[in-house]
Amino acid sequence: CCSTNCAVCIPCCP
């Protein structure tokens, strides 16, 4: 999910 929608998957990306 992070690869496409980081903002929606937080906290998923650094």
Curated annotation (Swiss-Prot):
It comes from the Eukaryota. Contains 3 disulfide bonds. Keywords: Disulfide bond, Neurotoxin, Secreted, Toxin. GO terms for cellular component: extracellular region. Signal peptide: none annotated. Expressed by the venom duct. Disulfide bonds join 1-13, 2-9, 6-12. It is found in: Secreted. Belongs to the conotoxin M superfamily. The cysteine framework is III (CC-C-C-CC). May act as a neurotoxin. This is Conotoxin Fi3c.
